[in-house]
Structures are given as C-alpha cells and as structure tokens.
Curated annotation (Swiss-Prot):
Binding site for RNA: 180, 195, 260, 350, 354
Location relative to the cell: Virion; Host cytoplasm
Protein's name in the database: Nucleoprotein
Biological role stated in the UniProt entry: Forms the helical nucleocapsid (NC) with 12.71 N subunits per helical turn and a rise of 5.3 Angstrom per N subunit, protecting the genome from nucleases. The encapsidated genomic RNA serves as template for transcription and replication; encapsidation by N is coupled to RNA synthesis. Forms the encapsidation complex with the phosphoprotein protein P. Before encapsidation, the newly synthesized free N protein, so-called N0, is chaperoned by P.
Ranges for region P protein-binding: 1-398
The gene coding this protein: N
Assembly and binders: Homomultimer; forms the nucleocapsid. Binds to the viral genomic RNA. N0 interacts with the phosphoprotein (via N-terminus); this interaction allows P to chaperon N0 to avoid N polymerization before encapsidation. Interacts (via N-terminus) as N-RNA template with the phosphoprotein (via C-terminus); this interaction positions the polymerase on the template.
Biased segments, Polar residues type: 531-549
Organism of provenance: Mumps virus genotype B (strain Miyahara vaccine) (MuV)
Bias kind Acidic residues: ranges: 437-447
Gene Ontology CC terms, in alphabetical order: helical viral capsid; host cell cytoplasm; ribonucleoprotein complex; viral nucleocapsid
Keyword Transport: no
Amino acid sequence: MSSVLKAFERFTIEQELQDRGEEGSIPPETLKSAVKVFVINTPNPTTRYHMLNFCLRIICSQNARASHRVGALITLFSLPSAGMQNHIRLADRSPEAQIERCEIDGFEPGTYRLIPNARANLTANEIAAYALLADDLPPTINNGTPYVHADVEGQPCDEIEQFLDRCYSVLIQAWVMVCKCMTAYDQPAGSADRRFAKYQQQGRLEARYMLQPEAQRLIQTAIRKSLVVRQYLTFELQLARRQGLLSNRYYAMVGDIGKYIENSGLTAFFLTLKYALGTKWSPLSLAAFTGELTKLRSLMMLYRDLGEQARYLALLEAPQIMDFAPGGYPLIFSYAMGVGTVLDVQMRNYTYARPFLNGYYFQIGVETARRQQGTVDNRVADDLGLTPEQRTEVTQLIDRLARGRGAGIPGGPVNPFVPPVQQQQPAAAYEDIPALEESDDDGDEDGGAGFQNGAQAPAARQGGQNDFRVQPLQDPIQAQLFMPLYPQVSNIPNHQNHQINRIGGMEHQDLLRYNENGDSQQDARGEHGNTFPNNPNQNAQSQVGDWDE
C-alpha cells in the first residue's frame, strides 16, 4: 500500500513538472505585425522631450492603430537610455512582432512632423500620417493635451536634468498602470492614487507632470492589449532586479514598482502557503488535506523550475498560471483564508469568497486562529531563553487582549489616542445595565468573563467616587471599545426587582441572578460554578478575576 501512495505522490508532482521545452526554444512562427520604433541618437534634451510628448499623443490618439501605439510605447520606455538603438533590441526577442527602427533627427519647429534620418525607412505619407495622429486627440482629453496642466508641453527643456525629471514623472505613471493591467484593470483606481502619492512624497514624481486620468487609462489599455510591450517590460523588470545598490534613478524606480507587479495573479497560492503551511498548526494533519498538500508541494517545485520569469506569469500570459489556481486545492485554501481573516486585517481587501470556498474548512481556520493566537512556538522560545513563567505570561496577555480587556486597565484595552491618566477611568456612561445572558453554544473555554444563563453583569453603583455615569464621555473611541464588555441583551422592566452592584476596588463584588418570574432572588453562579450570595451583607469575595484585573 505504501508503494501505491508513493507512486501517487510522484505522479502528482510529475503532472506539474511536464516537459515544456527549452527556455530559448523558438515557437512556431505566426503572422507578425510591423512595429516602427523611433530612435534618437542625440542626447539633446529638447528633441527627446518633444519625442516624449509625441509618443504620448500617439498612444492617446483616437485613430491610431495598435502597431502605432506599440511602437510609441516601446519608444517611450526607451527614452531615458543613452543608447536607444541597443536598448530597443530587448523588444526583438518577442516572437509576436517585427521591430523596425526609424532614426529621427528631430521635429519641424512648432509641429509634431518628424524629421527622419537618411537611414530611416519612412515615407512622406507616413510622416504626414503620424503628424495627423499626434493632433487627433479624443474629446475625452481636456485642453488638447494629455497632461493635467495645459502649459506643460510648451515649456522649454534645454537641460538633461529637466528632461529626466519630466520623463521619469511620465514613465512612473505608465509603470503604475502596469501593476493592474492584467489582474484588476477594471477596478477603482484607489491603489494607483496611493502609489502616485507615495512617489510624489519620495520626489520621484512631480505633480506638475501628472497625466489626465483618461490618458493613464489609454496607456493601460494599450499595454494590456500588446504582448510585445509586456514582454519588453518583463525584460526591463529582470534588469532592474539584477542591479546592485549603486544603480541609476530609472532602474531603482523600476525595481521599486516591480515589487507590486511580481507574483500578480498568484495571490491565492502565496496566501495559502503563508497561512496554511506557514503557521504549522495542528489542522494540517487532517486526512482531507493530504492530497492537497501533495499538490502544493508540486506547485512549489514548479515555481522553482520556472525560474526568474515565474514572477511575471500574469504579465506574460503564461499558461502555467492556471496550475496555481486555488480551485486545485479548495479545502486547504478555505482553511488558509479562515486563518488569514483573523490574523491579517489586510485580508478584507482580498476577495476570497470563491464559488469553491468550503465554509466548514473556512470556519476551522477561523476557530484555529482564534485559539492559537496565544500559543508559543517552543523552538523560538528556547532560542530566546524564555522560562515557563514567561511563556505563560505571554499566553495570558494574548488571551486578555483577545477578550477585549486591557493589560490591567479596568474598562477596556489601552487606547493610544487617550493619555494614560484618562485611561484609568472608563469613559462610557450607562443609564441602564441590562441582563447579560450567555448563548448556549458559548462554552466560555477561553477563560473570558462569562456567566451562566440568567446571570446579570455587574454594574456601577450609583453615586460616589466610582460612579461611572457621572463621568464625562472623554473619548468616543475608548467608549466604543468599553461598551462591548456589557452587551445589551434586553432592557430590564421597571416592575421587576434588580440591584446595581459595585465593581472596581470595592469590598464586595456580587453577581446577581435575575429571576424573570418575579420570584425571590437566588444565588448566581459564575463561570466556574462558584456561588455568589445575593445578600450584600455577607462578606463574600468575588472569585471572577476578570473584574478585578
């Protein structure tokens, strides 16, 4: 039987690691489109800045063909290079298009009419057509310019530093559009705005050279539709990853943006590894996970076998990305999502509610994460030299915080927005303290301040120094955190007898049992079955420690 299981494991792994051909193998040729890419051999900043605006206009033109936009994009991303002729050779590796280089000496004054070099393969009709395309912006582009500020195009640019600042400001916006061009291109642009704000703060993006949102959308659409451009950008990302600490501004910028692009489309796979395998909690031993654990093992081996380009499977439209879809390991994916929703607040931004999400295993992950938050990794604890008392203290601290209680502060957790002096007094004001009833399915196994059915929560006594009702509402955040300790179940009718107990530093902390039938009051039982008499004259000390901490 063991041989069959080993054969099954080996078979599962080999399914993922099938022969895909050599890395440099040439696929069967298909029809290729001719793409004209413009090359400027001079470092003249005025000419290059004019070419920058020309490429932006071609991309945004409403009558430009796809090949026109592809050539304009490759030219745009090559403008910072000192040798554009050599840099554009990166695009020659693409089997999707035939790249034609057109050397340009400049533009006619006041127009976007190209002045080709003698070696350029451009006819007079093509030059006139490009000039018309540059002036044919769609009506959705305001002020006849792709920029937000209408006077940006006409500004002189006679210094290399000026050109680089403007060029990098435009290119960084184009790179940000690459981040979501394949995975969530139709989603709201909140993430793009946050990245723009980040690069403005870093000084890499000047706000004056911001493009209009419509121009940014057209750039993203052109990149999404062109595999040639995305293959070219992948080579740029790989070059940026190989750079050392002493790099130029452009590749430092590309390397930074590349962190947002890497492993896009593989989020479910990496989150499953992080929250299912990374936590190493006991539910992984479930027999239902055995087959899917073998699947994850084969996928990790496949990712390593794909090499450096594995990070850009979505950008390259690689078919191998389908192997990493969470539909191939739904149970352990559901468990990992349950763990992640408890441990990571950023999981709220991830759409994990897939049709194959198993609610049962998702709940297993949620409950496991809640129970295991206070556990201590013995190996790490041994490395730190923690004593058993210190390990117990850490566990108790996490348990207290998980129940919504602060570390020794009555009334709630520590609020960083309120000074410590104000935190010593609860800020919530109560008019009526209702009865607190525990649900039948809550066993109160985490050591929280629970009560049996019919037990009433302690309340502040009226008047005196500890009268919480006369305290001003000092902070709404602290009040919101304090109120869940006494959840409102139902209001107590006026004709029924009830009593307000004293808490916090008093000699007696009596828990009353509320009798709905109007009978005489009975002794209440706490969370561990301890009996608390209702007679306030008896000198009985409360054994529910949560109210004393």
